[in-house]
């Protein structure tokens, strides 16, 4: 099985987004500041890294929307063992 290992979501108001996800879901939000592009890390589970990581839990982050960035929508990262075989499977099964 190839698990989802990370997610990212854009925001237009970082303080509001961080407060929302913290209040609604209890996520720990860590603002990385200007030096890191105002990225906000989202910790969704108490344990980080694979040992002791709750099954199905992943961490991710939020990034500011910018007019010159092409991909400004939520995205997921899936861990695979063999990227070439996975690309072939995607193409064979109608993916792009």
Predicted regions and their residues:
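Core segments of cupin and vicinal oxygen chelate
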Residues: 8-57, 92
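A solvent-exposed interaction/effector surface
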Residues: 23-25, 66-70
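Vicinal oxygen chelate
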Residues: 12-15, 75-96
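Basic, gly/Ser/Thr/Pro-rich low-complexity segments located predominantly at protein N termini
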Residues: 31, 65-66
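Short, solvent-exposed beta-strand edge segments and adjacent coil->beta transition regions
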Residues: 2-6, 71-75
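A generic structural micro-feature
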Residues: 1, 54-56, 68-70
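Short, charged/polar surface micro-motifs in flexible loops or helix N-caps
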Residues: 46-49, 68-69, 83-84
């Amino acid at each position: 099985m190839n698990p989802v290992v990370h997610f990212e979501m854009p925001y237009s108001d970082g303080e509001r987004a961080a407060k929302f996800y913290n209040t609604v879901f209890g996520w720990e939000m860590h603002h990385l500041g200007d030096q890191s592009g105002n990225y906000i890390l989202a910790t969704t589970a108490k344990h980080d890294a694979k040992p002791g990581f709750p099954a199905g839990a992943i961490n991710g982050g939020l990034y500011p929307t910018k007019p010159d960035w092409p991909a400004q929508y939520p995205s997921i990262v899936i861990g695979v063992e063999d990227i070439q075989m996975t690309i072939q499977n995607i193409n064979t099964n109608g993916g792009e």
